[in-house]
Amino acid sequence: MAKKSKVAKHERQQALVEQYAELRRTLKAEGRYDELRKLPRDSSPSRLHNRCELTGRPHGYMRKFGISRIRFRELAHQGQLPGVTKASW
């Protein structure tokens, strides 16, 4: 489990990215880079790092499922992930 402060920071950053998304898009399209520079630093989507939805873990993130590899394995073994089966060959 990630630190609560890191998870909270990530949520704040996501909110800022969503809040400024349309403004950033229009400023970029119009080439108004000075105004773009004045926006909050955390409003840039490139500063976000994918985190597990369940635990907040930043590493081992599986983009297709939105969770970390550890939680993926646990949920797959329990049969909680539809369409996921253990491989055998």
Curated annotation (Swiss-Prot):
UniProt keywords, alphabetically: Ribonucleoprotein, Ribosomal protein, RNA-binding, rRNA-binding
Sample GO molecular function, one term: structural constituent of ribosome
PROSITE patterns per record: RIBOSOMAL_S14
Cellular component per GO, a single term: cytoplasm
InterPro entries: Ribosomal_uS14 (IPR001209), Ribosomal_uS14_bac/plastid (IPR023036), Ribosomal_uS14_CS (IPR018271), Ribosomal_uS14_sf (IPR043140)
Family classification: Belongs to the universal ribosomal protein uS14 family.
HAMAP family linked to this entry: Ribosomal_uS14_1 (MF_00537)
Job of this protein: Binds 16S rRNA, required for the assembly of 30S particles and may also be responsible for determining the conformation of the 16S rRNA at the A site.
NCBIfam families with a match to the protein in the record: PRK08881.1
Name by which UniProt lists this protein: Small ribosomal subunit protein uS14A
